[in-house]
Amino acid sequence: AFLMTKDAEISIEVSPRYINGDYFLRGRKLGFNRISFGVQDFDPQVQLAVNRVQRETMFFQVMEWIRAAEFESVNIDLIYGLPYQTVQSFEATIAKTLRLDPDRIAVFNFAYLPNLKPIQKRIDPTTLPDSATKLTILQRVIERLTSQGYRYIGMDHFAKPTDELAIAQRSGDLKRNFQGYTTLPTADLIGFGLTSISMLQAAYAQNQKHLATYFSDVAAGHHGPQECGFNCTVEDLLRRTIIMELMCQFSLDKGAIARQFNLDFDAYFASELAALRELAADGLLHLGRDRLEVTPVGRLLIRNITAVFDAYLQQKSGRTFSKAI
C-alpha cells in the first residue's frame, strides 16, 4: 500500500459507458480527487465510424454524478481528425462540451496508424478530414474555447483560469511528460500493469505488451516485468529540456540552456538554427539574439518547430508516426 499526503493529486480515467453514480462516490471515498473521461465526438456518424457509440444524455448524467461526488477537477478528452468530421460538426461537439462545463478540455489529433493498430484498418481513409480541414478545426477550437474563458495550455489542453494548469502556465512552472501537461516538477512516473511506461529522471522503461509474458514475469518475482528500456545520454537530456521548454512556454532562453549544459548555444545548434530560420520566415517564430519566441500561428505547429531539435527523427524516417496536424 502507498501512504498518500493530504494534498496529493489522485486522478482516475473512466469509461462513461460502464459506470453509475455509486462508482463515483466510492472513488471519492478512496481518495480520488480528479477525474477524466473521453467523449471524442458527439456526432453519431463519427461515433459509429470509430465503434464508440455513446448517448449524449449519458455524458450529462455522468457529469451530474461527478459533481455530486465533489471531485475537485473534471477533464474531458476530444479528438479531431476522426472519420466524417467537418469543421461544422466539430463546432457542434465543442458547443455541447461547453454545456458540460469541465475544468479542463484536452483536444487531441487522431493518430491514424493502421500498420501499428490493425483495428484501424476498418476505417476508410477517404473519410478522414485532410490536414487543411484539421488545422481549421483546431483554429476554431482555440477561438471558441478561449472566447468562453478557457486558457490555451500548450499544444492540446485548455483549462479554466482558476485551474492549476492555467496557474502553472502563468507562473512558468508548467511541465510536460509523455502523458500530457502537468503541474508536477519533474516527478518520476512509475507504470503498473500491461504496456505501462515508467519515466525516471534519465531513463524510460515499458512493461511487457503481451499478457501471458507479463503474468509469467510477475509470477517469477521479477522486480519489473519490462519489455524494453532506455537510458538517456546528456545529449538526450539537453534536447529534451529544449523541446519541453518550447512545448510548455513557447519560448526558449538560449542563455539559460547554455549555462545549464555548459555550451555555446548558437555554435552547438548551428544547423538547427538554420532550419528554424526557414520556419521564422513563414511566421512561426521569432529568432532573437538571446531567445526563441513562438508566434500564435507557430503554436498550432509547435510539433514541427520542436522536431528540429529531435536528433532521432532522421533515424525514424522509415517508420510511420502520427502527424503533427
Swiss-Prot record:
Molecular functions (GO terms): 4 iron, 4 sulfur cluster binding; coproporphyrinogen dehydrogenase activity; coproporphyrinogen oxidase activity; metal ion binding
Alphabetical keyword list: 4Fe-4S, Chlorophyll biosynthesis, Cytoplasm, Iron, Iron-sulfur, Metal-binding, Oxidoreductase, Porphyrin biosynthesis, S-adenosyl-L-methionine
Domain Radical SAM core residue range list: 1-151
Listed Pfam families: HemN_C, Radical_SAM
GO cellular component: cytoplasm
Disulfide bonds: none
Pathway: Porphyrin-containing compound metabolism; protoporphyrin-IX biosynthesis; protoporphyrinogen-IX from coproporphyrinogen-III (AdoMet route): step 1/1
Enzyme Commission code: 1.3.98.3
Keyword Transferase included in the entry's annotation: no
SUPFAM superfamilies reported in the protein's UniProt record: Radical SAM enzymes (SSF102114)
Binding site for S-adenosyl-L-methionine 2: 40, 52, 77, 111
Subcellular compartments: Cytoplasm
Cofactor note: Binds 1 [4Fe-4S] cluster. The cluster is coordinated with 3 cysteines and an exchangeable S-adenosyl-L-methionine.
Catalytic reaction(s) noted: coproporphyrinogen III + 2 S-adenosyl-L-methionine = protoporphyrinogen IX + 2 5'-deoxyadenosine + 2 L-methionine + 2 CO2
Domain of life: Bacteria
Biological process (GO), any one: protoporphyrinogen IX biosynthetic process
Family: Belongs to the anaerobic coproporphyrinogen-III oxidase family.
Function summary: Involved in the heme and chlorophyll biosynthesis. Catalyzes the anaerobic oxidative decarboxylation of propionate groups of rings A and B of coproporphyrinogen III to yield the vinyl groups in protoporphyrinogen IX.
Subunit and interaction comment: Monomer.
Protein name stated in the entry: Oxygen-independent coproporphyrinogen III oxidase
Organism of provenance: Thermostichus vulcanus
Primary gene name: hemN
